[in-house]
């Protein structure tokens, strides 16, 4: 399958990634992506940016080198109540927010605690995507989370990077994907790139989705406008004309 969108990418601003914003945009353009999300880690990630970075996205272009640019954040869930490490004032300015659990920002809890964190964060209207919930370091009740995502219109990410960097993720990601298929929940495939050469490349995630027969209509990033319409319907991207 051809993917035209990657909403989960990092720049050197994240502290442990290796390419700049412009290098990422150039690579996205080179490989034919139509939409690129820059979603650097929130400030509680060691080495991550401060809030001024996220509050200053107004200086950034909306389009560059033929690519529509989404300016967002992979925000860290910092407690089991679903609190994020960026305030509402910042959240409402962003085009896209991925909410993720990272063990350097919150201790892994029980299945019940981890599930509660994801359920609670989906009550936040600014959250668009749940990041890498197939991470076995944070065991969850996958079916409860997937059903809640459908109720709250939150996208479930299938994270290609998890297949490599988070040991044991392959089976949990497949379980999540099968539940999304069962309950007809929209998914988005993300590279979680930390260097530009990973952008728009989802081979392991794509192979798994083909294996389980994921319906293409449930995959948000196989068309340019699906993600843009999704975000506009949530009241975002007011400056972007889709006509």
Curated annotation (Swiss-Prot):
Binding of Zn(2+) 2, residues: 16, 41, 194
Single GO molecular function: phosphatase activity
Residues engaged in binding Zn(2+) 1: 8, 10, 74, 192
InterPro entries given in the database record: Phosphatase_YcdX_put, PHP_dom, PHP_phosphatase, Pol/His_phosphatase_N, Pol/histidinol_Pase-like
Gene3D superfamilies for the chain: Metal-dependent hydrolases
Annotated cofactor note: Binds 3 Zn(2+) ions per subunit.
Cofactor(s) needed by this chain: Zn(2+)
EC number from the UniProt entry: 3.1.3.-
Disulfide bond positions: none
Record key words, sorted: Hydrolase, Metal-binding, Zinc
Binding site for Zn(2+) 3: 74, 102, 132
One Gene Ontology cellular component: cytosol
Pfam family, one: PHP
Family statement drawn from the similarity comment of this UniProt entry: Belongs to the PHP family.
NCBIfam families referenced in this protein's UniProt entry, alphabetically: PRK09248.1 (NF006702)
PANTHER family, A to Z: PHOSPHATASE YCDX-RELATED
Designated name of the protein: Probable phosphatase CLD_1129
Organism: Clostridium botulinum (strain Okra / Type B1)
